[in-house]
Amino acid sequence: MKIYWLFLLLATIICFWNESSARITWNGTRYQRKAYWSQAIIFFAVVIFFCGLRSGIADTGTYIQMFKGYPSSISGMDLKSVNKDKGFFVISVLFKQFISNDFHGWLFLITLISGVALMIGLMRYSEYFGLSCYLLIASTMFTYFVNGMRQFIVVTIFFCATYMILEGKWTQYVILILLLSTIHGSALILLLVYFLRNVKPWGAKMRTVIFLSLIVGVCFDKLFPLFGNFLAETQYK
């Protein structure tokens, strides 16, 4: 709990600091508020440091046991025995062989990648960087650094690479999503996001998507068992 209050205090300071010193820059199409990199580095350095040095929060214990069970060298890898997330497995084995067998370093590296990707994404796309930092802590969304870290690293890298969607870089986007799907298979659903880039807000297509989403939400109790049966024989059973 003390760490949470520390994060919240830091986020509040960054928020006020950013509001009092934000720069107004021209990004080629419009004026945009921009934070200073020093603010971003200070905030995320603290968050990454404490989250990266954890050893027993949420599902961290499961990941630690998973890491300990991985082979310590490439020669010991058997990809045929890995049913899911082979990219994550390979990265972990490479870490054990070339960097360290200590899970602390492994957890810190994953936290570092997630944190840097999130920081870059917020610096690129957030008009109110300080407020974004505050909401990250106040809403407890920062806990994804320590719970569900495979999903979170996929989400943060995707967020950082949003420019591929905005600039229509289809080939690069597909390659990235396919690579991310080797870390967590659910990343494949992000391929659909690309096709929403040209959908006009509140246009016919967008209203259709919203309508279908509402139907799924209302019928969730009936659809969930069917979805569970569909996944019964997959890696997410």
Where are these regions (language model features)?
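Loop-to-helix entry region of an early transmembrane alpha helix in multi-pass inner-membrane enzymes
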Residues: 86, 98-113
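Membrane-interface transmembrane helices that cradle and orient dolichyl/undecaprenyl
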Residues: 158-172
